[in-house]
Each structure stands twice: as structure tokens, then as C-alpha cells.
Amino acid sequence: MNVKTQNIQLEKFFNPDSVAVIGASNTPFNLGATICNALKHYLEFPGPVVAINRKAEEVSDYPGYSSVKDVPHDIDLAVIITPASVVPAFVKQCGEKGIRNIVIESAGFSEQGAEGKKLQMEINDYAKQYGIRFLGPNCLGVMNNVSRFCCFYGAYDGMVNAFNKAGGVSYVIQSGGVGVVIFESLMDDMQGINKMVSIGNKTDVDEADLLDYFNSDNTQVISMYLENVANGIKLMNVARRVRKPIMIFKSGRTEAGTAAALSHTAGMANNDVVFDSMCRQAGIIRLKSISELYSLPKMLTEMPLLRGNRIAAFTNSGAFGSISADIMTEAGLTIPRFSPETREKLSKIKGVFNINNPVDIGPALPQVYLDLIDIILAAPEIDGLLLMSSIWRDFIIDVIKEVMKMCKHYDKPAAIYTPNSISRIISVRKQFNIPIFDSLEEAVRALVVSYEQFRYLRKKER
């Protein structure tokens, strides 16, 4: 199957016109019912939805049938959330009905021993027989923030906030639990998500397939959590074609981590040294933590890329200037001296404590901030800015908003850190979509990641 044909079929996972939720019923705590409820009441999904259960009962006012073959209209996507033992039979029914896209959210397959592996092989056989592409098994589902479609089980009304704003970052998550952590963090911060897909055991559709798909849609940055790589050569070849930033946090770096991944999503052990080498060759940014999955992408969606490693540190605290210099140097960034021309311009601004790099502005007024930053960003010896404000004042918000405009004007990025209450920072990020980081280390890491992406793209163009 060529890439174009594959992406056309994968499109139905994210933009189905009709959905069947197999296993949805009115039994208390039924997970399939939470999907129907979300589609009906929270997302107001415009297409037909049906519930498949033994009693053929309605769920959330959607009609019920005892088999997908009884549904009188075509179905684009089936979501199966039933005991593992009956999943193969439902996959066969879907094939006979002509359904070519299935999300299998049920667990109990190759991650749980010989019997589970046998069931998974049956699913594979039916999928090949009928030309079905499927996600999972043992996955959370799919969310498309652009079209307001979501088949996550356990969806609740608070998730509606996440659908108020579509962003530029799409996520591929092997673990449903990690997906929930990322989703909740982004929802609290009101960062817009583009799409999120949980792949679980990824028996059919894997991370490379989705990377290919996201390369052709309106995604800006692709962020992944993996416990193993299904096919390293395939992933590397696809990644080399992609010009969008790819970020991956992979667990299983140690023997203990690999053992845990095996029991969780049936992952095959991958050599971490080989994976690290693949990332460098394919231009994949390897992340160090779960938090980086949702904190760092905004640096690449909201700021220009860092085109060199020469950084100006700008603060109203001499201590933070010293601390940041250590962190940046250890990270491979440099803190160059300003040129005589830049120093002359800076010296004309009154009331500045120190015009050397790092700059210590002291307790200055907003216009002083902006005048200094304008000079620094315009300086040819500077590639980017680390902006730190140790004192929170309301005018800092206005300063940061203007700095965002300056960065776009000069085509240079700024990583922003203010060591104040998280609630204040989140409030600003929610309102203005500004990449403010929760720690100085995170802000410096964002600059490093931006520079890594620029260097790889430049290398590809040669």
C-alpha cells in the first residue's frame, strides 16, 4: 500500500462520518457508554452513531443493534471495547459489514500470555482477510481536536474545554495512562491539541504509519511516547521524509524499564544505543521526560527556530544571570560578549545594572525592558534570548506579548522563565498562548531543542 492510499484509509480514524461503538450498553460503569455519551452530549458529533450490544438497547439516545451487520447504513469506524475473548468475532463481523477502520480498546492480548497472543493472531488474520486497518489492541482511542471527534473511553464533560482550541501539536502515545497525563496537563494549561492517538500493542497501525499521516495533515509538531519501536528501519525512513519536528520520549532505557514495558504493552525489547543512533540520523529529537512531551513542543509552534547557539540572557536578578550561564554552558549553548556597537546602544538606556551578557536590568520600567530586548534581538552576534523575570508584575505580561512580536520580526526565538506561582504562569499561557516555562532548566532545554531542529533541517537541505 503506497503512502497516499494508506493515509486516505487512516483519515477515517480521525474524521469518520459514522461510528459503531461495540460493547456500549446501559450496564453501570460501562466504558463503551462513556464514548457514546461524549459523542452525544459533549462533542455533538454530527454523524450517525450506533451502539452494539446483546440486548440491542439504545445508549445515550443512539440506536442499538445486536450486530453491526444489522445496521442499515454504512459505518466508517468501529470502536470495540468488549472482553478480549469476543473481539475476534466482532472484527470478523466488521469485515463482513464492510467496515475498514477499527479501534480495539479492549485489553488482554499479547501483553498477557499465550492465550492473548492467540486472540491477537485471530484479529490479524481477519484484518488481512478483509483489508481492515486497526489501532490497538489495548489502547485508549483517538482524539481529533480540529473536527471535535473523540473515542477515548472514560471521556467526561470537563474534556470539552480541551476542544475549545485546536493547536499545532499531534501526539502518538503507546500508553493510555501517559496519554491521560498529557491530555490533563494540556487541558489544565489550555494548550491546544491537534490530534492524539493511543496505539497500545500497535499490532497493525504503528508509530511510523501515523508519522506518515501527520506529515500530510495540518500538524506542526509530532510528539510521541513509545515503549518500543515496531520497526526501526521503517520509522527511520519515514522520519527522514518528514520536515516537521519529531519528538520522542521512549521508556525502556534500562533493563528494568524494558521488562516493565514488556508486561504493559507487549513491547519487544529495543537496544537503547541503537535507538539513540537512529534518532540522531533521522533528525528525531529525543526527549528526557514525560513533561517534555507537552512543555517543549510549544517552543517550536510559537517561536522561530534557533539558528545558532549564541544566547543573550536577560534578567532582573544578577543571581539568575549567573545560574543561567552555568546551565546554558553545560547544555552546549554560548553566552557571547556583545559587540562594541551593541554595547554602545545598550549604554544609552538609563538605569540598567549591567549591560554585559547576561544583562541585569534591575527593577526597571516596561519600556526599558522593551528597548533593551529590541537592541539585543537586533544584534547580529545574538541568535536567541533567554528571558528571566524574578519579580512578577502585571506589566510583565505586556512585555512578554511584545517580545513575542519582536521574536517574529527578527526571526529569533526567546525562551521565557519566570519563577513565580504556577497558577499565574498557567493563567498567562491560557490567555495568550505564550511559551513560558516552569523551570530555568526547561527553558534552556527548549532553546537546545529548537537549535537541534534547525541544524537537522539545514543538514537535509545540503
PLM region spans:
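Catalytic-core regions of core metabolic enzymes
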Residues: M1-R462
